[in-house]
């Protein structure tokens, strides 16, 4: 992983995001948190990750304000990792990755998961960036500008 002190001066938002959640485990922890996982043991069983690596990634996500530790919701002595508002704001990132994967990484008819709107029971529509007038934007219609 890139040195966080070096990333502090990085002007690219994508590079800073990748520094925080770009490794396999951090992104999958966030995915599992959106799926309702909260306890260390549950993350470990789901991901099959070594305890020391999981501890490190959970700490990094807490230090960044993506997760917070709370007393267990069932009143037991356990503690739970819960997405903060900052963590919840990663939902579109997870959805975009999921949808890209659905479209590009599975053969026709191959079993995979879908994200469903609980209200309608329908698969959520494909996400795409849009211009102020509502037209879908492509990379060729955009440019990066540095701001202070």
Identify the role of each PLM range:
Residues 28-32, 94, 128:
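Short hydrophobic alpha-helical segments that form membrane-spanning helices or hydrophobic packing faces
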Residues 40, 44-72, 76:
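Canonical helix-turn-helix DNA-binding module
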